[in-house]
Amino acid sequence: MNIENEKNVEIKVAGIGKTANNALNEIIKAVEADFVAVSEKQENLDLSEAGIKILVAEDFEKKIQKALENTDMLFILAETDEAENVKISTAVAKIAQSLDILTISIIAAPSEAEFAKTGKAELKQFADIVITVPTEKISEEINKIFIKNIKVIEDIIRERGIVNLDFADVNSMLKNGGTAVLGYGTAAGENKEEVVVKQVLNEILEKSIKNARKILMNILAGPEIGLDELSKITRILEKELETDEASIVWAYAMKPDMEGTVSITLIATDFS
């Protein structure tokens, strides 16, 4: 594996509408990517710190296509608070699909029902992955949720550990994955492997992972964790699945400052 190439995977984050435009100003500080702000209102763009700003107008699609040139992975962020946001997200995802860009849409909505009304089915036709952030069920700020979701995938690609996944691995797992859910967990002490998996599963609010056929996982742990413990985590996770066809792919990085602790981030997709 060429580590330098993995660092140079071209990632872009597009924020659609006022809420996502505002979120970009925080995400810029936390994520290694290029940023595109898209809005129907010039005043939203004027407040954005994104390097590329695109007003939804007659030449919108041409500008999006140019902005997405030479991109490997695209995150599309939006909230359903503005009626056209999901439609605009779909237009961006369609262009990304035509350029063979791995496209992950993260949409904040009060509920799945609300998201469905604003065009989830149409978006799923063009985005490889669609993640719903159920704003009625969470207390965290939307900005932090967006960052957390992006970092799960970015860290798997960019962070170098003992067991590494590269962009090709991530692309094969997420391409045409459909609906996806994410979970996070950290545990220490006895039985931490069981505890951390339970935490991850409890964190997932939108959907059970039981029918997921693809699971991408990033594990961080202290130096005492060995192959037996890593295999145990995978076995515990496999017991939660109802299909024998599931593929679980994971990366592992050892952190000296995490002695006695294990942390997992997980994305499950390709639901049967």
What are these regions (language model features)?
Residues 1-272:
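Tubulin/FtsZ superfamily GTPase core signature
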